Structure formats: C-alpha cells, structure tokens
Amino acid sequence: MIDTTLPLTDIHRHLDGNIRPQTILELGRQYNISLPAQSLETLIPHVQVIANEPDLVSFLTKLDWGVKVLASLDACRRVAFENIEDAARNGLHYVELRFSPGYMAMAHQLPVAGVVEAVIDGVREGCRTFGVQAKLIGIMSRTFGEAACQQELEAFLAHRDQITALDLAGDELGFPGSLFLSHFNRARDAGWHITVHAGEAAGPESIWQAIRELGAERIGHGVKAIEDRALMDFLAEQQIGIESCLTSNIQTSTVAELAAHPLKTFLEHGIRASINTDDPGVQGVDIIHEYTVAAPAAGLSREQIRQAQINGLEMAFLSAEEKRALREKVAAK
C-alpha cells in the first residue's frame, strides 16, 4: 500500500514517545534506576499499550517510563539518534520529530535548554549516519502549566534556527489553547511554523481556537472536526492539514474502532490529511503498519492511501525547493 516511487514521511511522531523498550532497560541498568520489570518481555506491558487505554491521559502515562530513564544529556542524545535509526529502518525519507524538553528533563532535573541541544545533536548525527532527512518540532507540554511551557519556549528560542515549528500537546481538556496565546505570538515572531494538538480529547471548538488564536497551519489528530461541517469546509478551503494517527486514536479511545475513523471522510472532503504514527515505541507500531494494516482497516482505498502519502509531503514544513528535491531523489532510486 506504500507507493515506493513517492517520498514516505511521518510528520506527527513524538521523539519522547519512541524510546525503545530495550533502551529503557539498558538505561535503567546504566543509571541504577528501578524499573517495574527486569527483562524485556516483562517490561513491555509497562511501556507499551497492550490493550486500548480508557482515555488520552491514561495513554500518556505509558510514556513515563521512557523519560524516567533519561538521567543524563547523553541519554537524551542516544534516544534522539535511535529515533533516526528507527525512521531509516522503516524506510522513511523524511520525518518531523517533536519533543517536549521539559517532560524529558523532569525526572532528573536536567537543564531544559541542555535537553534541546542534546536532541539536536543526536538527530543531526543520526541523519548523517542513516541518510534520513529530519526536522524538529518543539512541544510545549500544556499538562504542566503555563510557566513550564514558558521555560520550554525559552529553551527552543535559544536554538531557534534548529527548530522548525512549535506545538502544544498534553491535556487538551484541562489546559485549553487560550492559556498560551502569548507563547504562540512569540513563536510566530521567531518565524516558526505552527501545529497544534486539537480535536483529540476536546471538540471542534478546540480546532477553531488553534487556527484562529494560535495560528495553526496544521492540526494534530483533529478527529473531532468530523462533528463540524463548516470546520471541514474551512480546513479543505484553507489547506490546513490534519496529521492523522490511526492506531493511536484507537488506543486512546478517541475513536472506537478503525472502521469509524474519520480519515476517509476527511480525504473525501478534500481535506489535506496524512498518515502518521504518533508514539510508535509506546504503541508497538510503525509507519508500515499504519499504511498496510490500519489504513485499509479504516476503509481507505488504495488511491486514498496514495493521496494521504502525497499529502504527507505537501503538508511537511519544507520549502517548495526541499519538497521538489526529495521527490526527485526518491524517483531516481
């Protein structure tokens, strides 16, 4: 179902949601951190979703063990490097990795700006080693409040040329976008793109707010757009992309089953929507699974899957020249 003549992208992928279980085990031993299990087989149920979680917040707790072992900046650098290696193994040509440095720093009080620098270094080295093209999206974790998000923003601004976009993720219901208007004003002033997690736990009004008040050019998940025909029309007309994450939306109980996922409807409506993983390490999936298993189960035709693959590059935070070069590079292989 993947068209090998086209670039394969993953533009909604959390670096801190893709820490390998084996790496969690090894870092736990290296830094003498107590883990809930001592073998890979017994650790996996604690760090991967085995059965669907009742809600988004429950799902997010599965990510916690991955960041609890980030006891040094070297550990952060390692997981960033491994993220690129995983992308290469999946056959991805281009990946946008998003990460929350405050979340990664929290367990061991690491310097937030230092985490940003370590991630930049690890990703850069991974791209050099594996030949994958990558850009970084900075996440503000709304769950930890406005002040913590301000600290993350300052850390990103200290490395503004290595950050492509700003995102807001976490507890959408408890911490609405209206709390972060000044943060996004500064992000736009820095020349960054804007993508926002919206319409995942909250309704279509959260998507409207992300677009109108925060300046979102893309929406992460956005499943609740299906409830508002005017919003769907607006997304299609303005070419505001939806970063769909099929398996993730089932595992968080945002959508009951793949057959009920709105991605097919979005594509039929002319909305620029793409297929992405979200937190592949926690979900136990990869981009190949999303294209070959999840997308057909969500009712997408072969042509719709191909369109979603095209959309992934069209939506990417790349210049027209960068997109053209990537298309030509893949076509020449």
From Swiss-Prot:
The keyword Hydrolase applies. GO terms for molecular function: 2'-deoxyadenosine deaminase activity; adenosine deaminase activity; zinc ion binding. Keywords: Hydrolase, Metal-binding, Nucleotide metabolism, Zinc. Its cofactor is Zn(2+). Its EC number is 3.5.4.4. The keyword Zinc applies. Transmembrane segments: none annotated. Pfam families: A_deaminase. GO terms for biological process: adenosine catabolic process; hypoxanthine salvage; inosine biosynthetic process; nucleotide metabolic process; purine ribonucleoside monophosphate biosynthetic process. Substrate binds at residues 14, 16, 170, 279. It catalyses: adenosine + H2O + H(+) = inosine + NH4(+); 2'-deoxyadenosine + H2O + H(+) = 2'-deoxyinosine + NH4(+). GO terms for cellular component: cytosol. Zn(2+) binds at residues 12, 14, 197, 278. Belongs to the metallo-dependent hydrolases superfamily. Adenosine and AMP deaminases family. Adenosine deaminase subfamily. This is Adenosine deaminase. It comes from Shigella sonnei (strain Ss046). The lineage of its organism: Bacteria, Pseudomonadati, Pseudomonadota, Gammaproteobacteria, Enterobacterales. The gene is add.
